Design a protein with these regions (language model features):
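FIC/Doc superfamily catalytic core
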Residues: 1-127
Length: 127
């Protein structure tokens, strides 16, 4: 499949909008980390045959654990997950509460990347 990747500019815009609504410092802590996070799924696709959920999980884990932003990394992780799914014909079906718990689990190392990918499979559908 020809995947549509999350664009850095799109993610930065969504991150800024989220922080404008919910509060926080919108600065980028480390642009190199952000670039690295955004390349994780592409590298995964180049060397393996992941499905949409594994690629979405790669974005999520990278953002939630590498902290490229000063604030809002978990929110950015969820935004990138949802954006990747939408760009590739899927959408999240989980409630906001369930999605928040899942992201907190990823950020706290209670949910692995494989487990989050399984969660995405269970909580998404075709658009």
């Amino acid at each position: 499949m020809a995947w549509v990747w999350v664009d850095k500019g799109m993610l930065l815009l969504l991150h800024d909008e989220s922080l404008a609504e919910h509060g926080g410092d919108s600065r980028l802590r480390d642009e190199g980390l952000l670039d690295s996070v955004l390349m994780r799924p592409e590298n995964l696709a180049a060397y393996e045959q992941p499905d949409f959920a594994a690629l979405a999980a790669s974005y999520c884990v990278g953002l939630a654990k590498n902290h490229p932003f000063v604030d809002g990394n978990k929110r950015a992780a969820l935004l990138a997950t949802g954006l990747f799914l939408l760009l590739n014909g899927k959408k999240l079906t989980a409630s906001q509460a369930d999605a928040t718990l899942a992201i907190l689990g990823v950020a706290g190392s209670e949910i692995s990347e494989l487990e989050f990918a399984a969660w995405v499979r269970r909580n998404s559908k075709d658009r």
